[in-house]
Amino acid sequence: MIGAGDKRTRAFLFAIIAVGLVLRIAAAILLPEQNFPDAVLYREQARQLWQSLSFDDPYRMPLYQILTALTGPGWRALAFDVFLSTAAIWLSFQLSLALFEDAMTALVTAFAMAVYPYFIFYAVVGLTETLFVTLLLAAYVCWYRGWFTAAAICSVLSILTRPTFDLLAPVLVIYFSLLIHRLTYTATAKRVAGYAVIYVLLMAPWWVHNYHAYGTFVRLHLGANLTLYGSNNPNNQSGGVSDVNQDFSQFEKIPDLVERDRAYRDAAIKYIAEDPVRFIKLAGLKFTRFWRPWPYAEDYRTPLYVVGSIVSFVPVLILAIIYLLFFASGHFVRIFPLLLFIGYLTAIHMIMVGSIRYRLPLEPFLIVFAAAALVQLAGRRFRPP
């Protein structure tokens, strides 16, 4: 048995991280430029930020574009994404170690993260996923270690990347404080207050920007209700937002962006209330899209992508389910924060857009569970802390 701090563990971890780095560098060199519309837009926004210190996109959060502007679009931004993705390997090791206190399980987790095709792919395509996943993992590691201030900083930075985590983070502060670290109610209240202070301090510049841009307080951005309506309207047939029959012309006539945002929200709620059966059917379609083993987009439904996706994701999913069914019974309280995020993210994308791209942030948690199952099935029993 190897321990978490002995030389063999450190050597294995270093080798795994090196393999992950080499694979990401190879992908950066060999993978053709994908030119995702979002990636092209992020690069243009980074140039705009660098040249004029302006950010005029009402539908996106700014942190990834700010970091791209600071590193410079091109190979330096790519290198930074590769660094973040490689750091996520180390963070996954730390998360598994914090959960199970078993070095072998942590090493298997790190190895899976290092070679997992989706993490390699997203490390080199210029999207926000890599930054968001790295910050999310960092927040969870810090919470499990009891570093609430660092966890709060990582959480809010993840919200400034993508606002997905906004509603769940304060709930997790309470859960980790009361049930993982067994702090008193007074100490928990202090942790929540600390999170609130950090949230305000880090979000305040963005709020000032939004107030100058829109003349009113906008806490996150104006994209959520656009997506809500795009995902819930009579013309949406697939559960995505790329249906050819989508029509937003009635809203584009509204010049005020905040009023337009409210109109999107009201129209979506009206549609859901008037046809709840259709809403439920769409939610089912979105669930299927979200958990589908291979990509939905036509460009990525070639045999290579389909087989590669199935071979990588399906074993992880099956092993994660095996862990949850057969090995997690005495460990539920400790793993619940991961399960909560998996359920939370799934629920959001059953209401909003269903896409395997948006599933990526929960896949490190599936890998953690899968690694635990694999080690248990191999006969190395461990007792959860």
What are these regions (language model features)?
Residues 75-76, 264, 270-274, 278-342, ...:
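Membrane-interface anchor segments at the N-terminal boundary of transmembrane helices
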Residues 62-66, 72-90, 107-110, 122, ...:
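Loop-to-helix entry region of an early transmembrane alpha helix in multi-pass inner-membrane enzymes
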Residues 31-45, 54-67, 75, 218-221, ...:
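Extracytoplasmic catalytic/substrate-binding loops of multi-pass membrane glycan-assembly enzymes
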Residues 1-2, 98, 139-150, 176-183, ...:
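Membrane-interface transmembrane helices that cradle and orient dolichyl/undecaprenyl
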Residues 211, 217-285, 289:
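Membrane-proximal stem/loop segments at transmembrane-domain junctions that anchor or position
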Residues 76-100, 115, 138, 318-325:
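Transmembrane-helix motifs of polytopic, lipid-linked glycan transferases
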